[in-house]
Amino acid sequence: EAVAPYERPALSKNIFYLREIADADQLVEAIKLKDGRTLDADIVVVGVGGRPLVSLFKTSIPDVYAVGDVATYPLKLYNELRRVEHVDHARLSIEEYDYLPYFYSRTFNLAWQFYGDNVGETVLFPDNFGTYWIKVVGVFLEGGTPDEYKVARVQPPVESLDQLAK
């Protein structure tokens, strides 16, 4: 649901988003859609994300450091090391700071920003388009069980909004 407003302008220009590849070999001649239609194609652009092969960077030479998109950084908000691929982070990471992951993109006449992490149940707000990911960050218990107490400590993603009503 969240991608529909971004797919519509592309579809109007005969650009299709495919989420699965089957029976792939080395030569592209056509693309078969789930609805059975076949589209002739000479080239397919695949976006799969990026993760550097950092094992190639290992060295025993002193004072050699990784910088830029291949380097991890301690994100206090999530208590873990992560790669942060954003110019804002590159400008600020010379010193310790509390960074909120952020990126943005522009497609056709649409522009959007993403803040934080996409863990938990997706909740769409259609009036002013946006998506929020719901995660437990605290609990109020009246005579709670040990398992309910653990929820506050673990802070799991919410698998279903129905869970919040229980």
From Swiss-Prot:
SUPFAM superfamilies cross-referenced by the UniProt entry: FAD/NAD(P)-binding domain, FAD/NAD-linked reductases, dimerisation (C-terminal) domain
A single MF term (Gene Ontology): monodehydroascorbate reductase (NADH) activity
Key word Ribonucleoprotein present: no
InterPro entries from the UniProt entry: FAD-oxidoreductase/Apoptosis, FAD/NAD-bd_sf, FAD/NAD-linked_Rdtase_dimer_sf, MDHAR3-like_C
pH dependence as annotated: Optimum pH is 7-9.
Family classification: Belongs to the FAD-dependent oxidoreductase family.
This protein's name: Monodehydroascorbate reductase, fruit isozyme
